[in-house]
Amino acid sequence: KKNIIKFLDSFYSIDINSNNFFAFTGTNGKSSTAYICHQLLRNMDYESLYVGTLGIKHNDEKIQTKFSNKTTPDIFELYEIISSLNFGLDSMSVCLEVSSHALDQNRLDGIQWLNSASILNIGEDHLDYHKDISSYRDSKFRIFKMNSPIKLVIDESNNFAKDYNFLNETKLTSISSKNNFSDIFYKITKANFKNCEFKIFLNNPPSGQEIHKNKKYKFKCALFPEFNITNLVFAISSVGFDEFSDKYVNDLSFIKLPKGRTEVINNISKNIIIDYAHNSHSFEVLLCSIKKYFDNLILVFGFGGDRDKSKRAKMLQIALDNSSKIFLTSDNSRSEKFENIIKDAMKGNNEGDITIIEDRKEAIINANKFLDKNSCLLILGKGHEQTQEIDGKIYHFSDHEVVDEIYN
């Protein structure tokens, strides 16, 4: 592996380990947190690169199309991406989404040092690949095998650290909004549909940040709902607190979520949110956060074909528990028959207001008819995506374009 890295350094005329890597893994929130981290670094005048599900974004340029069909590139693709940018400094910051597949397959071998490594959360996903939740969790914790002075973990997952001998001498920094004895505790003091204010308490900051121990920082931002504040706290903790003040409120209103991540559609008469949620954990977190703001939630979503079948019924049950009306539709059925996918989902979930419309566009149009001013339509599963894969063929499709067609 060392010889491969030497060859790649020579071939591309770059030293990949001169860059500052900020790596984020988790069942949900990887795209948003890496994208937020990129924006924080840009606001601090650092040269930065975002790499992940959305594609690549260098500094303030538009997001470029994906480098491959993987969330996380392998080391060869990463060299190709960085070398193609011709960045002006000796090094830059790279904000990386790191998938469980990438960690299991050692795609990041060759990166000797991470500025920070984070586990945002661990739910249940990709069991078609990992086979069981234990193996899935093992892959996530492998991010902490990489050299990094800052290792952040959501407090609920910190208990699993004792299962990994390689962490016996490692400092993990826990983050929580529930446990005020966690290393980093944050508290939301004001929140609505458009704005949020919160405080961060540094009880036991990460390595290199000890100077900020016991300090309290105030922030305001335009993110919604509450789980995106968790993502923001991880991003802030990753870049460190040197650039923030504990004397006044730090204004982070410039931070935006990426397209299709809890995206409130603006300039229309109704309440519509498009989100990438596509597993039981993200469904539960999203719906429980959103429903407190509306009388009724109307959902449009489907289930990916040729993927983990065990999550389908769980997703539908969570949707039934947290909404008033559901439209089940297609979402990359791939080689599976739509009716078989729905049959899997409906096992034990026969009660509830469920309408089945295979054509995703028609499902969105019909769901929109039930909206009133106190309701919200959530179109879930595809987010930023602009394609549908059905029967081995890929078609152009965008949830955003359907909504735009309805209202404009």
Locate the predicted segments by residue.
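ATP-dependent carboxylate-amine ligase
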Residues: 2, 150, 169-171, 209, ...
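Adenine nucleotide phosphate-binding catalytic loops in nucleotide-utilizing enzymes
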Residues: 130-137, 166-284
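Residue-level signal for inorganic ion chemistry
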Residues: 7, 24, 51, 78, ...
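Short, basic phosphate-binding NTP loop
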Residues: 1-23, 32-46, 261-263, 368
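Flexible active-site lid/hinge loop adjacent to a nucleotide/diphosphate
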Residues: 62, 68-163, 280
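N-terminal leader/targeting and accessory segments in enzymes
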Residues: 1-10, 220, 226, 336, ...
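Conserved lysine of the Walker
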Residues: 30-33, 231
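Short beta-strand-centered segment that lines the nucleotide-binding/catalytic pocket of NTP-utilizing
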Residues: 45-59
